[in-house]
Each structure stands twice: as C-alpha cells, then as structure tokens.
Amino acid sequence: MALEIDCSGRTALVTGGGNGVGAAICHALVAAGASVWVNDIIEDRATAVADSLGGAPHARPVKADVTSPEKIRRMREETGPVDILVNNAGIPTTGFGELKLFVDTAPEDWEAAMRLNLGAVLHVSHAYVGAMVDRGWGRVVTIVSDAGRRGERYQAIYGAAKAGAMGFMLSLAAEVGPSGVTANCVALASMRTGILADAVERDPAIGDRLARAYPMRRLGEPTDPAALVALLCSEGASWMTGQVYPVDGGYVSAL
C-alpha cells in the first residue's frame, strides 16, 4: 500500500518560507493538498514562492518579521486561524557574522539569533496554537538543528536556542495533545542553502570536507526534510507527537 500524505482542506503557515528549506516545505504541503501562507521578512521572496505554487487559493504571501510581536499580531489578523504551523524561520550560529567561541562573544552577538531561533517560535506559536486547541485539530512542526542535540564548537548560542525550541515543543505536545493538536520537531544538520550553498559553489572542497562527517557523504538538500514535515502535518500523523525527528544524513546516531 502506498503511503498517502493527505493535508487536503487544511490551511498552513510556514515562517521563513521564502527560500531554502521553507520554500521546499511550502511545495510539499501544497502537493499534499494544503493551502499555504508563505511568510518571509522579504515580501518579494514570499511572493515568488507563492506564485511558483500557482498563487491563491493554493499559496499566498504574508510579509512579517517574526521577531516582532506586533508584526506577528498583524500577520495573525491577515491570515486568520490556521490548521498547520511550521516554525521554520531561523538564522545560523550567532547570526550572519563570523563564528566565535562563546567566551569571545558579547551579549549583542546573541540577541538576533535568540530572538529568531527561539523567541519567534514562542511568539508565533502563541499567536496561532490557541485556535487549534479551540477547534480540536492542529499540527505544529518546528525546524531545529543537531546543534541543539550535541555539543559543537562555535555553536553555543545557536545550540542553546535550538535546544530551547525543542524543550518548548515537547512540553507543548503534552499540553495540547488532549485537544487533538500534535507538536513535533524536525532536526537538520548542514543544509545546502543560503550562505553555505554560496560557499560550496565558490569552493566545492568546502562541501566535500563537510560531507565527510555524514554517513551519507553529502550535505542536506532543502527537499530532504520537506516530505517528513508534510507527513507530520497530515491526517495520518495523529498519534505522532512530542518527538524530535532527525533528517541529518546520520550525523547524530542515538536511541
């Protein structure tokens, strides 16, 4: 029997959906029958993804900075309640600057990464999950990182934020489960997106060196986690909750 991922009739919001993994998730959800709000801080990116999915009613762009509670409130007014929330928006390490050991950082180095990688998960979830509970159905998936599952140099702040997001989601699952709402995480490793994709394009040796850390001997592609996210958001995943599912090429092997 073929596995059917069915999100028909459901409305989803994907934060950070304007490129990379977020865009791939939007495509997977629409393919599974959902209609999707594509969120991004850059309106043109969100619009491009929505247009690539055929536009309304299949996909609509919604611009918002998800580190701002006020802009999240406005986004919630625009989208209305949703059935599916994918917390995907995030930034690497301590932002987009140079990698630093924790003892060499200053608090201002942490703030952007913590606001987006943890704070946005809390604020966006708070804005949307209550309506799921009231309606008796919902799916929440947060994209996290193996940096929150194992200790690595230069990852103290990023790892702390992602571990915090995981802890939040596990507790959320316990709270909202009786109302028919599930909450799960998908943990990624090095993905060929954004800054890393640009670096690998300039110097393929960077990708080769990183890939040696993975049993699959390659970096992740944006499409790798998308099907799993769609599955977790589907009707058939009603007994899958409170878990962290790795899509990491075997980078972290653990019970």
Across the structure, where does each feature detected by a protein language model lie?
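Short C-terminal tail/terminal secondary-structure segment
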Residues: 1-5, 96-99, 150, 230, ...
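Active-site helix of classical SDR
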Residues: 125, 161, 169
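Alpha-helical segment proximal to the catalytic Tyr-Lys
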Residues: 130, 174-175, 238
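Catalytic Tyr-X3-Lys loop
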Residues: 91, 103-122, 137, 141, ...
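Canonical Rossmann dinucleotide-binding motif of NAD(H)/NADP(H)-dependent dehydrogenases/reductases
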Residues: 3-37
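Residue(s) in the substrate-gating loop at a strand-loop-helix junction
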Residues: 145
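Short, small/polar-rich loop/turn modules that mediate ligand/substrate recognition or access, typified
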Residues: 177, 182, 240-242
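C-terminal substrate-recognition "lid" of short-chain dehydrogenase/reductases
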Residues: 125, 137, 218-247, 252-253
